Amino acid sequence: KDALEHTGFAPKKDGEEHVEWNYN
């Protein structure tokens, strides 16, 4: 998966939801 697919979100893992690491 693209690591920068979601701005402000960590890359999606296999079957896991995106992790919010910088949403503020």
Curated annotation (Swiss-Prot):
Glycosylated. Signal peptide: none annotated. The keyword Kinase does not apply. Residues 1-24 are annotated as: Disordered. GO terms for molecular function: calcium ion binding. One of its GO terms (biological process) is shell calcification. Keywords: Calcium, Glycoprotein. Nacreous and prismatic layers of the shell. The keyword Transferase does not apply. On the 2D-gel the determined pI of this protein is: 5.6 and 6.7, its MW is: 50 kDa. Calcium-binding. This is Calcium-binding shell glycoprotein P50. It comes from Unio pictorum (Painter's mussel).
